[in-house]
């Protein structure tokens, strides 16, 4: 099993290209199931989750051609996928594939909307809380689907097709919003999705669906209107830049006292996180090239944050920000409101010398002057990269185990950091 070895103490200086967003690419790939015509996606990141979803779609009969690099010989350019879902040979998504990635559950809505039947295993993915699929199923039931749970599978039928409906989510859910949005595009009549997720990835999905012929208004607000259409057509769409990757490298730069240009990043996608970084003492400037992040030798200031649905502070940056706060000049409180059990990185950060106390859904971080390298173990995607950030600022060697989590969400992480001066390498074995 691969490990990542880090020798801390180096400032990050240089340019890090930001990849396409995984959390946008996955639902966009799944949206291909809604049409018999080709969907071409550009700027798709090269990640384990993307490769797994290609396998899952292939299981349904979808043909995917990878057209390599978009921009000449740039090794960091996103790949282009040409997706042809003209023929669906199987409407079952099996346990052995779906259990490995939660987002693969989203095939349920498009298959049901287009084919009228789907059988999808209950999902897997990161071990963060329970994250039930009830909101997805309730949305599809509202659209007229008949749904049963049988031996660990969701069996859904809509023999007469889906019908437009009013869908009200009791709590904001990005995944359920994706499901409702995709299914409603082919439903007969109008649908209104209330308390919808406002995340940029939802907007990106809506933008792509509109290019495919969907009639959608209100994406990015809490109320989305969808006028169903009979069919969707071919389209070409570029995946938006990854705001979580952007925030991660911005926090790593602030942690090491560096100066990094995050090329291709969009500041409008993560304003709350950038505001927190400014309060912590980082200098952040938007340019035509991307976002420049710097921190001088004044030290890191403590900042309280509470995770919240977009446009609030992203839960997917909570672990990384906690790593930054371990070296703050004072104490801060980090409150997690989105997922339970998302403090699994606390014990591992403590192995590096961090002082963190848990009080329910809040972590109280007492900043320390120095962290010391040690062997640590990743527990999930975002926790694993928080350990890398801490390792960059720790004295001595940090060895991060279970780095397969990183490969699910960060493209060429060691390469991007090492080109900016980090002493980091992957050790196979």
UniProtKB/Swiss-Prot annotation:
Please name the NCBIfam families in this protein's record: murA, PRK09369.1
Q: What is its EC number?
A: 2.5.1.7
Gene, per the UniProt record: murA
**Role played:** Cell wall formation. Adds enolpyruvyl to UDP-N-acetylglucosamine.
Which family does the record claim for this protein? Belongs to the EPSP synthase family. MurA subfamily.
Set out the biological process GO terms recorded for this chain's protein. cell division; cell wall organization; peptidoglycan biosynthetic process; regulation of cell shape; UDP-N-acetylgalactosamine biosynthetic process
**Catalysed reaction equations from the record:** phosphoenolpyruvate + UDP-N-acetyl-alpha-D-glucosamine = UDP-N-acetyl-3-O-(1-carboxyvinyl)-alpha-D-glucosamine + phosphate
- List localization entries: Cytoplasm
Pathway(s): Cell wall biogenesis; peptidoglycan biosynthesis
- Give this protein's Gene Ontology molecular function annotations: UDP-N-acetylglucosamine 1-carboxyvinyltransferase activity
Q: Where does this protein hold phosphoenolpyruvate?
A: 22-23
Q: Where does UDP-N-acetyl-alpha-D-glucosamine bind?
A: 102, 171-174, 316, 338
Q: Which Gene3D superfamilies match?
A: Enolpyruvate transferase domain (3.65.10.10)
Specify the protein name. UDP-N-acetylglucosamine 1-carboxyvinyltransferase
Q: Which residues form the active site?
A: 126 (proton donor)
The entry's keywords: Cell cycle, Cell division, Cell shape, Cell wall biogenesis/degradation, Cytoplasm, Peptidoglycan synthesis, Pyruvate, Transferase
Question: Which residues are recorded as modified (2-(S-cysteinyl)pyruvic acid O-phosphothioketal)?
Answer: 126
Q: Name one GO cellular component term.
A: cytoplasm
Q: Which InterPro entries match?
A: Enolpyruvate_Tfrase_dom (IPR001986), Enolpyruvate_Tfrase_sf (IPR036968), MurA_subfamily (IPR050068), RNA3'P_cycl/enolpyr_Trfase_a/b (IPR013792), UDP_GlcNAc_COvinyl_MurA (IPR005750)
């Amino acid at each position: 099993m691969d490990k990542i070895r880090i020798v801390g103490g180096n400032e990050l200086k240089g340019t890090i290209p930001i990849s396409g967003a995984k959390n946008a690419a996955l639902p966009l790939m799944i949206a291909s199931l809604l049409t018999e015509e080709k969907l071409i996606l550009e700027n798709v990141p090269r990640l384990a989750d993307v490769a797994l979803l290609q396998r899952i779609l292939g299981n349904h009969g979808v043909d995917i051609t990878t057209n390599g690099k978009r921009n000449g010989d740039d090794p960091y350019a996103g790949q282009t996928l040409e997706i042809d879902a003209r023929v669906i040979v199987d409407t079952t998504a099996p346990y052995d594939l779906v259990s490995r990635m939660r987002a693969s559950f989203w095939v349920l809505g498009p298959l049901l909307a287009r084919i009228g039947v789907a059988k999808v295993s209950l999902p897997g993915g990161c071990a963060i809380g329970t994250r039930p699929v009830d909101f997805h199923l309730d949305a599809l039931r509202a659209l007229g689907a008949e749904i049963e749970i049988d031996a660990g599978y969701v069996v859904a039928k809509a023999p007469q097709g889906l019908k437009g409906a009013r869908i009200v989510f009791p709590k904001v859910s990005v995944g359920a919003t994706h499901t409702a949005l995709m299914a409603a595009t082919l439903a007969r009549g109008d649908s209104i999705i209330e308390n919808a997720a406002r995340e940029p990835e939802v907007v990106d999905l809506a933008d792509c669906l509109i290019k495919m012929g969907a009639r959608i208004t209100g994406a990015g607000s809490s109320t989305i209107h969808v006028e169903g259409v009979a069919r969707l057509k071919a389209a070409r769409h570029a995946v938006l830049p990854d705001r979580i990757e952007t925030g991660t490298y911005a926090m790593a730069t602030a942690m090491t006292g560096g100066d990094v240009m995050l090329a291709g990043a969009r500041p409008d996608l993560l304003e709350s996180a950038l505001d927190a970084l400014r309060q912590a003492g980082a200098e952040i400037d938007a340019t035509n090239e991307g976002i420049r992040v710097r921190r001088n030798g004044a030290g890191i200031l403590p900042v309280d944050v509470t995770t919240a649905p977009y446009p609030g502070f992203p839960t997917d940056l909570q672990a990384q920000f906690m790593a930054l706060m371990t070296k703050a000049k004072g104490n801060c409180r980090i409150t997690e409101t989105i997922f339970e059990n998302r403090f699994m990185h606390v014990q591992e950060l403590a192995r590096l010398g961090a002082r963190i106390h848990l009080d329910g859904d809040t972590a109280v971080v007492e900043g320390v002057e120095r962290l010391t390298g040690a062997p640590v173990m990743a527990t999930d995607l975002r926790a694993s990269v928080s350990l890398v950030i801490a390792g960059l600022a720790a004295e001595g060697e940090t060895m991060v185990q279970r780095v397969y989590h990183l490969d699910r969400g960060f493209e060429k992480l060691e390469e991007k950091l090492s080109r900016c001066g980090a002493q980091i390498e992957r050790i196979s074995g």
